[in-house]
Amino acid sequence: MVAVKKFSMKRKACVIGSGPNGLAAAIVLAQAGLEVEVFEAQPIAGGGARTMELTLPGFLHDFGSAVHPLGVGSPFFSSLPLHEYGLEWIHSPVPLAHPLDDGTAVLLERKLEDARASLGVDGEAWCRLVRPFVEQWNEFAPEILRPQPAIPRHPSLMARFGMSALLSAETIARRFQSERTRALFAGLAAHSFLSLDEVLSGAIGMLMAIPAHAVGWPVPRGGSQAITNALCGFLAKLGGVVRTSSPVESLDALPKCDVVLCDVTPRQLLAIAGARLDDYYNRQLQRFRYGPGVFKIDYALREPIRWRAAECRRAITLHLGGSFGEIAASEKAVRSGNHAERPFVLLAQPSLFDASRAPDGKHTVWAYCHVPNGSTENMLARIEEQIERFAPGFRDIVLARRTFSCADLQSMNANLVGGDINGGVLDVRQFLARPTWQQYATSARDIYICSASTPPGGGVHGMCGYHAAKRALRRMAHGA
């Protein structure tokens, strides 16, 4: 990480929102010597990185993000002593399992050589696709987790990535001979919330696969709240303060400060700061587009899920969707504003490897599917049908469940507009101008946006907040 010279005169910063990006921004500002206050509307800090008893007492569920390849692989988080504040990463033997209808599962192995062997006829093609970036992860991660366009620091590496990343997932999948490998890649690419025939869907698929081999897909012991608690603990050591149950409806409600960083999406920024921003910038924010939402279920279980494919118990994360064609149809339906009859389901079973999540012998599971933004459709039956498809009898072991519609999610985290967990659709049009061509800067010199609606986008990595704070500090240092 690049150091920033400390200011000789004491300056104050206010940060709105205590999600990972807000806390990252606050830490960067505090490291530069600013007095920092963070204001959080909810009673618990963390935004999408919170852990709560959502079903039964003693069962700990992640409200938002649960599995963190970009958390453990974040250049900024890796530069902080978060382990000293209780953050411990837990890895399952394999990062991901993708069960199929024949009673087997295709596994995304952690080691590339194991992946080559397990993917059989496609093993070599898979390694060709991801090996350069896995082997040079420490160079690759900072490249992909910074604002674009940018002059690459490792041009040959990024040129090679770009040759594949500009393709759709559908095109990349044609490199594989086996339907099993195509299905595996479809599930990875579906994290894009794009149709799998769209440009950038292939890039997201690669960006999910590469860290699986480079750093894994771990969970924090005790839940995602552990990430938040570690960030808050380190911020407190630097002198920063987090004020929970402190919603900010207008910048006028903030104490006097030199700079404000907003871990909010464009819609909230308009409401909070619109009066301080010029009309042209406000119109740009109004044109920002949100992506599909999610319908989420948290489960308290009597026992572990009995998967037909026993190897599924080796992974924390499962992708439930069958073949490439089925997943592609599901994502295309959602992208077109419809609900998939057989939705692609993402499922995490962290308590298999972290006993602190549930009472002895019991388990927690987290699952969601994609839906149109703002959907009011109850997807419970369809999600459970997909789980039962690969784990018959699943419903019989459910002690309690809690569902979250798009509106429910937004009520608990205002950044999840219409249930969008990515901070806005990440298509070609919104890849560079996110949320505008100015990215973190606004039309007001002392106001910045630092949420997942800025580069590099969604995920618990803190890099949006890191880059926004660096931008603000550079401007302050130059008196601009």
Tell me the role of every PLM-derived stretch.
Residues 207-248:
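Helical element adjacent to the flavin cofactor pocket in flavoenzyme catalytic cores
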Residues 240, 246-358:
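Mid-domain catalytic core of redox enzymes
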Residues 1-13, 31-32, 429-431, 477-480:
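Extreme N-terminal leader/targeting segments of oxidoreductases
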Residues 178-195, 341-346, 393-455:
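A glycine-rich dinucleotide-binding beta-alpha-beta segment and adjacent secondary-structure elements
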Residues 114-117, 267-273, 300, 359-386:
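Conserved FAD/dinucleotide-binding core of flavoprotein oxidoreductases
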Residues 7-135, 425:
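N-terminal glycine-rich phosphate/pyrophosphate-binding loop and immediately adjacent elements
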Residues 101-200:
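Rossmann-like flavin
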Residues 452-473:
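A conserved FAD-binding loop/helix module that cradles the flavin
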